[in-house]
């Protein structure tokens, strides 16, 4: 389990740097990406849920039950917002420490990626150039057929389709040839990158697994610290939810009791 956690964390951290390397944009820390996604998701759920609650309370049934769900919803939203403020710095510290501990490994992997990219770029450029040439050649062959169709009538449509079919097959076959050639050219570099990654991992295992065990221990320690620091915030959340749940339960029981009395009186 510890190995899985460490592996996912390393891939997550290196993945963000690899994206920055290929796209050449400003790097975003793992915590910033997680925080942005979580914030957007929570805000959408919160706003959408509040709209549904408001619609229900405005309905005839909602007015009759008078559960005060909207007040409880606002209280719950406030409690969740407080939790996010409390746990944010703790999670930030966790990512900072984990990123620091895996800095050397990430630098080595990024170096390998950069080297492979430089080697395969000429093949990618060549493939793109050949593909553009094939498309242009196909367009030149098809253009006269389109003019011929515009000059003719409906009976020439079938003739045009018969003429286009071999041209389309020719383009497909030529494209397949270029793709196969590109795959053959890139295969050695893919194998090389895979071997280098295996070498990096093997280096961690050498010496009785001391280096790998150190990574595991550090990741486990950071997770333990995060868990301990988050406990007070989670307890505050639980305490904040108790009044909300109790208020909802009381309102619901009162509504059920009122409905029962009305049914018995009829």
Swiss-Prot record:
GO terms for molecular function: cholesterol transfer activity; phosphatidylcholine-sterol O-acyltransferase activator activity; phospholipid binding; protein homodimerization activity. Sequence repeats lie at residues 67-88, 89-110, 111-121, 122-143, 144-165, 166-187, 188-209, 210-231, 232-242, 243-266. Pfam families: Apolipoprotein (PF01442). InterPro entries: ApoA_E, Apolipoprotein_A1/A4/E. GO terms for cellular component: chylomicron; extracellular vesicle; high-density lipoprotein particle; low-density lipoprotein particle; very-low-density lipoprotein particle. The modification Methionine sulfoxide is found at residue 109. It is found in: Secreted. Gene3D superfamilies: 1.20.5.20, 6.10.140.380, Apolipoprotein. Residues 1-18 form the signal peptide. Glycosylated. Palmitoylated. Keywords: Cholesterol metabolism, Glycoprotein, HDL, Lipid metabolism, Lipid transport, Lipoprotein, Oxidation, Palmitate, Phosphoprotein, Repeat, Secreted, Signal, Steroid metabolism, Sterol metabolism, Transport. GO terms for biological process: acylglycerol homeostasis; cholesterol efflux; cholesterol metabolic process; lipoprotein metabolic process; phospholipid efflux; positive regulation of cholesterol efflux; positive regulation of phagocytosis; positive regulation of phospholipid efflux. Residues 67-266 are annotated as: 10 X approximate tandem repeats. Belongs to the apolipoprotein A1/A4/E family. Participates in the reverse transport of cholesterol from tissues to the liver for excretion by promoting cholesterol efflux from tissues and by acting as a cofactor for the lecithin cholesterol acyltransferase (LCAT). As part of the SPAP complex, activates spermatozoa motility. Homodimer. Interacts with APOA1BP and CLU. Component of a sperm activating protein complex (SPAP), consisting of APOA1, an immunoglobulin heavy chain, an immunoglobulin light chain and albumin. Interacts with NDRG1. Interacts with SCGB3A2. Interacts with NAXE and YJEFN3. This is Apolipoprotein A-I.
């Amino acid at each position: 389990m510890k190995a899985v956690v460490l592996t996912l964390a390393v891939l997550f951290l290196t993945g963000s740097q690899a994206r920055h390397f290929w796209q050449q944009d400003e790097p975003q820390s793992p915590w910033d990406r997680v925080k942005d996604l979580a914030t957007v998701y929570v805000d959408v759920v919160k706003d959408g849920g509040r709209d549904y609650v408001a619609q229900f309370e405005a309905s005839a049934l909602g007015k009759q039950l008078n559960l005060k769900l909207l007040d409880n919803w606002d209280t719950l939203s406030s409690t969740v917002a407080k939790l996010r403020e409390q746990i944010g710095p703790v999670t930030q510290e966790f990512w900072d420490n984990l990123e620091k501990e895996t800095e050397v490994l990430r630098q080595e992997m990024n170096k390998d990626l950069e080297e492979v990219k430089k080697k395969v770029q000429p093949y990618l450029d060549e493939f793109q150039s050949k593909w553009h040439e094939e498309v242009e050649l196909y367009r030149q062959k098809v253009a006269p057929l389109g003019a011929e169709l515009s000059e003719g009538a409906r009976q020439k449509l079938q003739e045009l389709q018969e003429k286009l079919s071999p041209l389309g097959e020719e383009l497909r076959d030529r494209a397949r040839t270029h793709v196969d050639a590109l795959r053959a050219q890139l295969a050695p570099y893919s194998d090389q990158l895979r071997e280098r990654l295996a070498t990096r991992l093997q280096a961690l295992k050498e010496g009785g697994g001391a280096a790998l065990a150190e990574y595991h221990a550090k990741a486990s320690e950071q997770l333990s610290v995060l868990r301990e620091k988050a406990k007070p915030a989670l307890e505050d959340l639980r305490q904040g939810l108790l009044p909300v749940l109790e208020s909802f339960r009381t309102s619901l029981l009162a509504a059920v009791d009122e409905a029962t009395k009305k049914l018995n009186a009829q």
